UniProtKB/Swiss-Prot annotation:
Gene it is expressed from: apeA
InterPro entries to which the protein is assigned, alphabetical: M18_aminopeptidase_1 (IPR022983), Peptidase_M18 (IPR001948), Peptidase_M18_dom2 (IPR023358)
Keyword annotations of the record: Aminopeptidase, Hydrolase, Metal-binding, Metalloprotease, Protease, Zinc
EC number: 3.4.11.-
Pfam families named in the record: Peptidase_M18
Protein's UniProt name: Probable M18 family aminopeptidase 1
Single GO BP term: proteolysis
Organism per entry: Borreliella burgdorferi (strain ATCC 35210 / DSM 4680 / CIP 102532 / B31) (Borrelia burgdorferi)
């Protein structure tokens, strides 16, 4: 199948639309880096656009705009459609979490008169990429009286940053240089440097005590309070244009916040009530297998769909309505895929691999080796998506996750398919996925928005 770079066929108005949309996205991904922050942003914007908490509604009718929140980390937005709900819904599901470092429950330690935060990495990171990189600390801490304290340090102009110190090349020959990439630094040594000045005291660990004193003075947080906290360490800094032509975006967390942003904007921008109920579901925990009560494996989707249908059907409601509605639904698993990286192109089947700037990739399946753990979209669904994109003049390309037996991975698709929902993976291509600086195309970003909006409209 012949590939052509679509950018050269755009007129100036189309190029400006892409560039303006990209600036909004860059502001979003620079500011909101954790699942709690993304969820709060989405809720705030939705409320301003007229979305109402579904728990406060007793009845639902076509055109109603509602949301369901799951423990401040996942959220679903829905616009009730004109068609009977049992005829199916259109889901777009993306995830709010990204690979990062999480503070341990008792994280503050002192070594050689330096204070550190001990961490446990979250998701599939290359550990060595996080060494000597400016980091910010974000999250929530619940004090012993139950008060919630929010933390966001490292991205404001006058904030300090934090760092995991690497070994200098003059002394790394035995300890690091000849090791495999996943052994360059042990997970236990991913410790964040946070302090170096001591306090005047006869007690041991003078630097740790000084750091804890500063934390208590500013945030009222005591050492024991970290037990009831969610502290996430993420790269500091803002999204940047990449290249002289500024056609690419470099930023942390584009997996999967590029799909979060585009799926949100597409449902928020719907001008008319859709035929089928449109649902934008932002979920947590995808990077560690969609586990936990805020992940897609928690059955929260089944809960809010059941509640929604009950408020539509009222006395006519029965469980079969829920099963029919799910079985007749379609879903886009809105997650990024691996673009060809010319420096490591040997891992790709280039005929079936996406390129930056060629439109939104359609990924029929993911998985490992013999499609293990994959959700393999049926040809009928792929045909539907293909016709939809072509009809709306949206640029698209095919995608697979590398050569057979080269590696592999998965998305939320298999969990959606577990409900009987016909599901396909469709999200922008990324270079340097799971790194502190992921790279995407502005053209692909905008075409993802157009594709998701067209899907909701049908």
């Amino acid at each position: 199948m012949k590939k052509q770079n679509p950018w050269i066929y755009l007129n100036e108005e189309e190029k400006n639309q892409i560039l303006n949309f990209s600036e909004s996205y860059k502001k979003f991904i620079s500011k909101f880096k954790t699942e709690r922050e993304v969820t709060a942003y989405a809720l705030d914007k939705a409320k301003k656009l007229g979305f109402i908490n579904a728990e406060e509604k007793k009845n639902l009718m076509p055109g109603d705009k509602i949301f369901y929140t799951c423990r401040e980390k996942s959220v679903a937005f829905a616009i009730i459609g004109k068609n009977p709900i049992e005829d199916g819904m259109n889901f777009i599901v993306s995830h709010t979490d990204s690979p990062r470092l999480d503070a341990k429950p008792s994280p503050i330690s002192e070594e050689n008169e330096l204070t550190f935060i001990k961490t446990n990495y979250y998701g599939g990171i290359k550990k060595y990429q996080w060494l000597s990189t400016p980091l910010s600390i974000r999250g929530v801490v619940f004090l012993k009286n139950g008060e919630k304290v929010e933390i966001n340090i490292g991205d404001n102009e006058n904030d300090p940053v934090f760092v995991i110190p690497d070994i200098l090349p003059h002394l790394d020959r035995k300890i690091q240089r000849n090791k495999k990439s996943d052994e360059i630094v042990e997970g236990e040594n991913l410790k964040i440097l946070i302090g170096s000045l001591p306090i005047e005291t006869k007690e041991k660990n003078k630097v740790k005590l000084a750091t804890l004193q500063l934390i208590k003075e500013k945030y009222k947080i005591e050492e024991e309070d970290f037990v009831s906290s969610e502290i996430e360490i993420v790269p500091a800094g803002t999204a940047k244009d990449v290249g002289f032509d500024k056609a690419l975006i470099g930023a942390y967390g584009q997996d999967d916040k590029i799909c979060v942003f585009t799926s949100l904007e597409s449902i928020f921008d719907l001008e008319e009530t859709p035929n089928k109920t449109a649902i934008c579901f932002l979920v947590d925990k995808e990077e560690i297998g969609s586990t936990g009560s805020t992940g897609l494996d928690s059955r929260y989707l089944e809960y809010f769909v059941s509640d929604m249908i009950f408020k539509i059907k009222k006395s006519e409601y029965n469980n079969l309505h829920v099963q029919k509605a799910l079985w007749n639904s379609k879903s886009i698993s809105a997650d990024v895929c691996a673009a060809i990286n010319p420096l490591f192109s040997s891992v790709h089947d280039e005929q079936n691999a996406p390129q930056l700037g060629y439109g939104i990739p359609i990924m029929k399946y993911t998985g490992h080796g013999g499609k293990s753990m994959a959700s393999d979209a049926d040809a009928e669904l792929v045909s539907y998506i293909r016709q939809l994109l072509n009809k709306n003049n949206i640029a698209w390309q095919v995608a697979t996750l590398g050569k057979v037996e080269e590696g592999g991975g998965g998305t939320v698709a298999k969990f959606l398919a577990g409900y009987g929902i016909r599901t396909i993976d469709m999200g922008p291509a990324v270079i340097s996925m799971h790194s502190p600086m992921e790279i995407t195309s502005k053209f692909d970003l905008y075409n993802a928005y157009l594709a998701y909006k067209a899907f909701y409209r049908e």
